[in-house]
């Protein structure tokens, strides 16, 4: 990497201890001398918070929130800390606290970014291929395309075996933020994520920078193990952010897209009423629609507090 600039790694942490193993691994890999950690303590309990604080040092900054403000706010704070502490950096690596990189994850991202930028300066991001926690040969996604009208992502190479796909770098609408190398120049021109707590923040940014003439890629040369999101097992409060943020994203593309998002939620609520499955999610979607109309955004705690327990049993 030209000039041996530092490579900040932003890791938001909420309730997980995986970060300690991740930091140890990255301190021993190829770019160890350049890696700088920005750990976001996202309102953790006192014991974990104290352990996170102990990571502070020459190569690590710890930013603490008094409460869980969500992944969006954590990554925003991490990007702001990067600008303050490592202003010379050209790239920033976003890494979820439950993502498990390997020794080649970061080198492959950097090498792919450098190769692409040498040919085209307007490369906004390069994402890792996400592989299954149950079978590391099975691809979950290698970036994705996204339809704002359908409100649906179409993951690349999903379900394929990694050895069968081989080493490829492909153009995508967005790549998952669980392991994403971001070009600081794109952030300076296009801005960073909006604070929407969780979900659709990385998708919206990927679509936004694309509209502004930047390009996003994903590569199978870089892999990361990450748990797959299962909407069936998610707490009802998650539905609030799925609905609220899909409406927010759809609103950037016009009334037809918003109408489509509202209709999808109508069908979900109707199915819940008819079958009795996930009926507790209905008031969260209703709150999401009311908040979208009023321009209100909430944290997880605020969402749960706003929905009466009689309407949302098991919401926590």
Give the ranges of each region predicted by the language model.
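Acidic/His-rich active-site region of diverse nucleotide-sugar glycosyltransferases
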Residues: 100-102, 108-190, 195
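Glycine-rich, basic loop-to-helix element that forms the pyrophosphate-binding segment
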Residues: 65-85
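A conserved acidic beta->alpha catalytic loop
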Residues: 39-50, 67, 99
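Short beta-strand-to-loop acidic/aromatic patch adjacent to the donor-nucleotide binding site
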Residues: 88-100
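Short, well-formed alpha-helical segments that are part of the catalytic scaffolds
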Residues: 15-29
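Non-catalytic, C-terminal membrane-associated alpha-helical segments of glycosyltransferases
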Residues: 237-245, 255-316
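Hydrophobic targeting segments
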Residues: 5-11, 26, 36-40
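A short, conserved alpha-helix in the catalytic core of glycosyltransferases
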Residues: 173-182, 186-191, 195-223
């Amino acid at each position: 990497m030209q000039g041996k600039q530092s490579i900040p790694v932003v890791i938001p942490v909420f309730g997980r201890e995986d970060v300690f193993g991740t930091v140890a691994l990255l301190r021993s890999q190829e770019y160890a001398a350049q890696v700088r950690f920005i750990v976001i303590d996202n309102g953790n309990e006192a014991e974990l918070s104290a352990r996170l604080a102990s990571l502070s040092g020459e190569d690590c900054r710890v930013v603490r929130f008094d409460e869980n403000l969500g992944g969006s706010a954590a990554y925003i704070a991490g990007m702001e800390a990067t600008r303050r502490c490592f202003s010379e950096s050209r790239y920033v690596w976003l890494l979820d606290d439950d993502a498990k990189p390997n020794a080649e994850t970061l080198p492959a991202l950097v090498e792919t970014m450098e190769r692409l930028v040498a040919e085209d300066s307007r490369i906004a991001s390069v994402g890792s291929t996400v592989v299954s926690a149950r079978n590391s040969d099975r691809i979950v996604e290698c970036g994705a395309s996204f339809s704002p009208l359908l409100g649906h992502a179409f993951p690349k190479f999903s379900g394929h075996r990694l050895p069968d796909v081989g080493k490829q770098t492909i153009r995508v609408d967005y790549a998952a933020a669980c392991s994403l190398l971001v070009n600081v120049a794109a952030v300076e021109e296009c801005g960073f994520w909006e604070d929407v707590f969780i979900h659709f923040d990385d998708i919206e940014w990927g679509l936004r920078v694309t509209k502004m003439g930047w390009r996003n890629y994903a590569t199978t040369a870089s892999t990361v193990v990450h748990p797959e999101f299962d909407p069936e097992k998610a707490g009802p409060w998650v539905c609030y952010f799925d609905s609220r943020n899909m409406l927010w994203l759809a609103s950037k593309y016009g009334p037809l897209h918003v109408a489509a998002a509202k209709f999808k939620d109508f069908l979900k609520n109707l199915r819940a009423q008819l079958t009795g499955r996930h009926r507790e999610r209905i008031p969260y979607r209703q709150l999401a629609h009311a908040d979208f109309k009023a321009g209100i955004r909430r944290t997880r705690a605020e969402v749960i507090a706003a929905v009466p327990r009689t309407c949302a049993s098991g919401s926590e």
